[in-house]
Regions:
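C-terminal and inter-domain tail/linker signature
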Residues: 1-126
Length: 126
């Protein structure tokens, strides 16, 4: 699979709620997920290393946002690197995000999120 296809498959699985396949097949054991921001101010902020840490932090999403969904609008791919322009929605949220990936052996090994943190924060369940 091309890197762009791996990333699209990840979004498809995430959107379908097939987290077992998403985490089991798409996420590399040594993934590094960087979510810029001050840890403690935003529940997802920080550098999360390893699949277990990735799963633990991704699992926070339903705790803070009802009906959270990410839908890619466009992707640019160069070699193993992919950048996705993503529509992010949840109850009280309708915005755009940018997600950067590096793919290795048909799995996401690096993910960096450039999200509209103010809109997401304002939509969080308090």
């Amino acid at each position: 699979m091309e890197a762009k296809e791996v990333v699209q498959r990840g979004y498809d699985l995430f959107g379908a709620g097939d987290m077992e396949t998403f985490f089991g097949e798409i996420i590399h054991d040594n993934i590094t997920w960087t979510f810029p921001g001050d840890e403690g101010k935003h529940p997802l902020a920080g550098v999360h290393k390893g699949k277990e840490n990735f799963i633990a932090n991704m699992s926070k999403i339903p705790e803070y946002w009802d009906n959270f969904m990410v839908t890619p609008q466009a992707m640019i791919s160069e070699g193993n690197k992919v950048f996705a322009l993503v529509k992010g929605t949840a109850d009280g949220m309708d915005t755009m995000f940018g997600h950067y990936f590096e793919v290795e052996n048909n799995q996401m090994k690096v993910m960096m999120t450039f999200d509209d943190t103010l809109t997401a924060f304002n939509a969080m369940k308090k």
